[in-house]
Amino acid sequence: MSIEQTLDELKQQLNYHAYRYYVEDSPELPDAEYDRMMQQLLSIESEHPELVTVDSPSQRVGGEALDGFTQIQHEIPMLSLDNAFSDEELEAFEKRMNDRLISKPVSLFCCEPKLDGLAVSLLYVDGKLVQAGTRGDGTTGENITENVRTIRCIPLTLQGEGWPTRLEVRGEVFMPKAGFEALNERALKRGEKPFANPRNAAAGSLRQLDSKITATRPLSFYAYSVGVIEGGELETSHYQRFVQLKSWGLPMCEETKQCHSLTEVKAYYKDILERRDALKYEIDGVVIKVDDIALQEQLGFVARAPRWAIAYKFPAQEELTVLNDVEFQVGRTGAITPVAKLEPVFVGGVTVSNATLHNADEIARLGVHIGDTVIIRRAGDVIPQIVSVVEARRPTDSKAIVYPIHCPVCGSNLERVEGEAVTRCGAGLVCQAQRKEALKHFVSRKALDVDGLGDKVVEQLVDKEMVETPADLFKLSAGLLTVLERMGPKSAQNVVDALNKAKATTLPRFLYSLGIREVGEATAANLAAHFYTLEAIQVATFEQLIEVSDVGDIVAKHVLNFFAEPHNKTVIEDLQEMGIHWPEIKALDESVPQPLAGKVVVLTGTLHKLKRNEAKAALQELGAKVTGSVSKKTDILFAGEAAGSKLAKAEELGVEVMNEEQLIELLN
């Protein structure tokens, strides 16, 4: 075989396996074998530079830095879309189309998520990528060919056969959530400013003059339409064109769907909106298009948008508002959290008047002042936060935020441990705020789960000095509780009954209820499974603690410090005297097969045939250590429906993923 033939064979193999990995998400080769083939290609091209072609996989690493971008002209304008913000506006869109159509009304739609990225045009000539450009103003864009070549999921050469001689593919370059988080983590470690959101990160990465930088960024791409078509024909259905493009190696959003009526379109919108936070990428709505290409051509365009497509936008997740004040709150472990008091603003479907500012470092990074106009962001159930300041609107009477040096509740000195971002009040349960939060945690659902003892009741109990420690809760009588607001005799008796019921608990729940720093539900369960008894945990050494799954140096130190504190020992003794108890944990019978012995597993997503706690218990019986987060230590992720960010991280780390059916098969 000649050098040229060897090179062609390597290119074909590398392109095929890149498609399997980046587009199909179904690799056939180990990473090491792919890397070996790539090194062989690079070695041949290094010895024979005259054989290097623009479609070679080696060109994905980036080339020489540019002085600036040249411009390209779009042969067919890249238009934007009109927006709809309600079902009524969507219905009006359908009516406008049907009023214009001479023949049949629209009966089939193609729907897809509206990705929050950067629109690009890819031009393939004879199956090879020869040009890539940004949308720009719709008629003129920037030539970003070298940067686009570095995006692994975009084919440099089309697969299969039947593609037109000249084919322009349009789509969105975006940065998946997991990649965005990893990129920002690396930036923070290097002391660099992180990106505000994935869209900014994608746009900034794509417009780098040095394509080697773009090559290091976790960019992806989904095709959504075509432009120029010469020397061939495509399907007459918009959806089938997607399928056609995918067969040629171009990525297609897996959420794209055909809908047979506007009722189905509305259901699709609602479904995507509900699953928005679980998707691997940021979206801000759904795009609805007439599926029939002939009808698209009949409907045509207005000045800036097609008549046959519309973007049904989600409620805004970012809005402008004014920072009126900052309130410093004290948490269960004494952490001081600055809370922004905002001019109320409707964002992400709710009215927001408070947002977290995290800590002193975040305030300094934002450079925010009281009185500033700020951009507030709310995503799903995430606490709203300020993402940036509009400094051009800063008023002359704005005030710098002064971080306190004393606890705003008890007046104790605040301290910041070296290496931590959080400032803390070290007064412990002497501080009323910490006492309230510790008691709320103690009775919470994942801890002792005391029904009827909500936050407001706990706050009243502390304010009236009826309770100081968790053990005091079990001394309360129905008669005493009736002095509280909205607490009649029946409600009071229900609380007492719930407290008595809560005395029978489990060791993991009890450990979690104590509020040891960094010891969540999963870590508490791992400690209990490892040591079997509370007494063994209390006397465990640092070396013994770090042998426990999910327990590192920091958590081990927190556990040691907690049990070394005399006050905490007294609280535990008092609770046991009040009748708190749990069943004995027996050591595992080594004669029983344990196929998951020593395996670290994570459960995520919605399970339909199993209850989460049942699945967790069954996995533990098989020897697995069930944790709450995905890391390099994770062996298996069991992913139910709408698995979200944990699934994305597992895929990024190469963790084995099993679905619910595989989980059931394993348990059986």
UniProtKB/Swiss-Prot annotation:
GO terms for molecular function: DNA binding; DNA ligase (NAD+) activity; metal ion binding. It catalyses: NAD(+) + (deoxyribonucleotide)n-3'-hydroxyl + 5'-phospho-(deoxyribonucleotide)m = (deoxyribonucleotide)n+m + AMP + beta-nicotinamide D-nucleotide. Its EC number is 6.5.1.2. One of its GO terms (cellular component) is cytosol. Disulfide bonds: none annotated. InterPro entries: BRCT_dom, BRCT_dom_sf, DisA/LigA_HHH, DNA_ligase, DNA_ligase_AS, DNA_ligase_CS, DNAligase_adenylation, DNAligase_N. Keywords: DNA damage, DNA repair, DNA replication, Ligase, Magnesium, Manganese, Metal-binding, NAD, Zinc. NAD(+) binds at D31, A32, E33, Y34, D35, S80, L81, E112, R135, E172, K289, K313. PROSITE patterns: BRCT, DNA_LIGASE_N1, DNA_LIGASE_N2. It comes from the Bacteria. The keyword Magnesium applies. Residues 591-668 form the BRCT domain. Zn(2+) binds at C407, C410, C425, C431. Its cofactor is Mg(2+); Mn(2+). GO terms for biological process: DNA repair; DNA replication. The keyword Hydrolase does not apply. The active site is at K114 (n6-amp-lysine intermediate). DNA ligase that catalyzes the formation of phosphodiester linkages between 5'-phosphoryl and 3'-hydroxyl groups in double-stranded DNA using NAD as a coenzyme and as the energy source for the reaction. It is essential for DNA replication and repair of damaged DNA. Belongs to the NAD-dependent DNA ligase family. LigA subfamily. This is DNA ligase.
